[in-house]
Amino acid sequence: MLVTNHVLSGAVIGASTRRVAPAFLAGIVSHFVLDAAPHWGKWRGRPKFMQVAVPDGLLGLAMMAAMTAVAPRGRRAAVLAGMTGAALPDLDKPSRVFFGRSPFPHVVDAFHWKIQNEAPHRFKYEVAAGLAFALAAVGLLRGVRRLSVRQVLP
């Protein structure tokens, strides 16, 4: 799954839990749950992977900034923790590019690789998931403002 979607799901988790440690841990768990769900992937070589990964990583960082900015002050730390936890397991990819190895033990990398349910024709799932997570996060963080009768009928 795209890291942007992991970030947005982490924002939902942080907004829902409102506590830093549970948000971080739930974010990590959510990463593996989402990676086990059907999603877009199966890149044919590193150049194609990088064409997707670089813009996705930058968009993920932008979403982290946006969701942190949208979050009310009292929820910001939990939202940031949820997003960080949700994105953390994918640090293996840039670590391999820049340092030649994953920061995680082999058993974690093997599990992460084994659970992937990717196919090249599932981009629509990524878009749908991203929209759903973004709307849920903004809804939880900003709330649905109710109109009073006085606002509708002067």
Describe the residue ranges of each PLM region:
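N-terminal membrane-targeting hydrophobic helices
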Residues: 1-154
